[in-house]
Amino acid sequence: FYVPNTRSAVRINGMQRLQGEVVISDITRTHWADSYRATVAPGTTPIAGKPATELDLTATDPDNVYPTIKLWVTPDTDVPVRAQFFLASGLLFRSADFSAPVDANGRKVIRKITYRNEVEKQRASVVDILDGQPRKIPSGWFNPDTLADGQ
């Protein structure tokens, strides 16, 4: 995170909001395969009228924002359908519903994620990925001197 007139990086807390109900860790720091141990719940649960397999994810790193996540995936392809994110206290804090994957550049990607605040039920935000094209990021974006020059 860049702040003009500072010479060092400013660390952003994982619970810092990006916009609406979406926080930094929802987008950048929740790596289910690397940061969680999964246990498969028996049977299936209907989600939006379709069967889903429940995975109970337990954080392997104590610094993870969400120590526990319940994740429902399609039984045949393991595509995420819904997730519930729990705080260390056990409080259900946030949930997410995932759209069906679409083809983008020869890969299947989830285009839309709806995040819901489970404490203030009326609050929700949608992340809609409009373009899945990879882009080269200018090296100046990672240099505070270049950012200060407005380049």
Regions found by a protein language model. Give the residues of each.
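Short, solvent-exposed mixed-charge patches
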Residues: 150-151
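Gly/Pro-enriched, hydrophobic low-complexity segments
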Residues: 14, 31, 50-144
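An acidic-aromatic
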Residues: 1-25
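Short, conserved active-site entrance elements at the starts or edges of catalytic domains
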Residues: 20-58
